[in-house]
């Protein structure tokens, strides 16, 4: 019996030693796991910080893109306004041309009447008051023609003023388009930096991977919107160039019509002087 008890005691002691060794191993494993957990939590915290930084960069890029789109829209609106002004200017120009043609016709009629009056003047000197009325009528026609010509000149001056205003508006639109292009270049650089930062992130958890995919999708969307804004800005610039050509053409036509008016005005003054000498 003593031998059995001694053997049992030795077995119990051996088990106690084994359990103590196992407990120490478990404690070491626990410490190792705890250390790994702390490292993992530190990595997650760093990743979260990088994600927050990317979010701020994305928000700033979105704000700048919205500002660029707004400026492009404003530029397009200015181009549309200038188009309407050019159209109104063309209408005024056409009306002035029509009045000038009418003035030329009346001047021709007055000149013909003056020539006829000159041919008949010597034979009509002894006639009654009807001859004086005829002369007064001719003078009234000449005065009316001169008034119409002066009105046409005022219309030309107004057209020239509107052309000057349109040129100023075109210069402002071009300046704003240049500013928009500069902002677009800056935004492209910022988007490129954001894209590089996104690629350098090391996301070990599924949630971080999902966030990265979401940010990449947002960047693609921003890039697409940026391309659209660039296209709109380019289109607005083409419209400005087209309008500038139209303004140049109208200025040339206006100059030609003014020269024509000066010639007609000279003829009108000569005719009026001849009629006055009667």
Swiss-Prot record:
It comes from the Eukaryota. Residues 105-134 have a biased composition (Basic and acidic residues). Residues 92-134 are annotated as: Disordered. SUPFAM superfamilies: Tropomyosin. The keyword Coiled coil applies. Keywords: Coiled coil, Repeat. The keyword Coiled coil applies. Residues 95-104 have a biased composition (Polar residues). Pfam families: Tropomyosin. Tropomyosin, in association with the troponin complex, plays a central role in the calcium dependent regulation of muscle contraction. Homodimer. This is Tropomyosin A. It comes from Echinococcus granulosus. The lineage of its organism: Eukaryota, Metazoa, Spiralia, Lophotrochozoa, Platyhelminthes.
């Amino acid at each position: 019996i003593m031998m059995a008890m001694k053997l049992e005691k030795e077995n119990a002691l051996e088990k106690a030693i084994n359990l103590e060794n196992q407990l120490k191993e478990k404690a070491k494993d626990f410490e190792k796991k705890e250390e790994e957990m702390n490292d993992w939590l530190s990595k997650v915290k760093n990743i979260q910080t990088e994600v927050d930084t990317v979010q701020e960069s994305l928000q700033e890029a979105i704000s700048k893109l919205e500002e660029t789109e707004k400026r492009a829209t404003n530029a397009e609106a200015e181009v549309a306004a200038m188009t309407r002004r050019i159209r109104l200017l063309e209408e005024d120009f056409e009306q002035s041309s029509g009045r000038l043609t009418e003035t030329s016709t009346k001047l021709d009629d007055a000149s013909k009447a003056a020539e006829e009056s000159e041919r008949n003047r010597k034979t009509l000197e002894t006639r009654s008051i009807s001859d004086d009325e005829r002369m007064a009528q001719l003078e009234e026609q000449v005065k009316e023609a001169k008034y119409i010509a002066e009105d046409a000149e005022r219309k030309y001056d107004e057209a020239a003023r509107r052309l000057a205003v349109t040129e100023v508006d075109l210069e402002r639109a071009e300046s704003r388009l240049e500013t928009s292009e500069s902002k677009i270049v800056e935004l492209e650089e910022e988007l490129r930096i954001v894209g590089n930062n996104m690629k350098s992130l090391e996301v070990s958890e599924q949630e971080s991977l999902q966030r990265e995919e979401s940010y990449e999708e947002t960047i693609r969307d921003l890039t697409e919107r940026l391309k659209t804004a660039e296209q709109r800005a380019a289109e607005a610039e083409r419209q400005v160039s087209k309008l500038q050509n139209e303004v140049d053409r109208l200025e040339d036509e206006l100059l030609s019509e003014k020269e024509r008016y000066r010639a007609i005005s000279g003829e009108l003054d000569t005719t009026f002087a001849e009629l006055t000498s009667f």
